Amino acid sequence: MNPQGHIVFIVDDDARIRESLCDLLASLGSSAVAFGSVGEYLSYARPDLPACLILDIELPDINGLDFQKQISDQDHPPIVFITGHGDIPSSVRAIKHGAIDFLTKPFSEADLLAAIRAAVALDGKARQERAELATVRQRFSSLTPRERDVFPLVVSGLLNKQAAAELGISEVTLQIHRRNVMQKMEAASLADLVRIAEKLQIPITRSRRTGAP
């Protein structure tokens, strides 16, 4: 099963379901770890790999939908729900809160595997984005206070003389700071620096835009 280098977590209180899913995934070359409760899953040291969480609705310690809500702002893998008692309100709630799919038992292998592939791909992309954000944040932390003042002015589109006037420094000094910002942020162009600023959510006020009153 592609992509490689991923792991599937299974949380279901039915031992037979856990065993059958682990066997299926193992036969396809996927790593899988199964748990009988959410508590067991949370106590597991998850490896740093793209992942998918196959989650039952009715669990001994918490309802799967409630658990989904609890972890909505945390870095847990995308969820594929499986349940023997599915209903439309539950499926709508699950999908609305980001579940990849909501499968009612018995479900087809094809549907499950398609959902797992989608979840792993989504998690891989999210991990890459988090890594890129961590990198640009580290670069931003290397800027001096003055360079941090210059950064939003540069990406706002102000001319050097306009930015220099706003900061009360010479145009030559502004150009030096601008060059340092470009180098430290490893921006190949102004457009590249703008994209970095967007990732960092660098604020740009109306007064900083070219032609603003």
Predicted segments with their positions:
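Acidic, metal-coordinating helix/loop segments flanking the phosphotransfer/catalytic sites
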Residues: A34-C52
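Basic, Lys/Arg-enriched C-terminal extension of HTH/homeodomain DNA-binding domains
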Residues: M182-P213
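Acidic catalytic/metal-coordinating carboxylates
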Residues: G36-S37, N63-D66
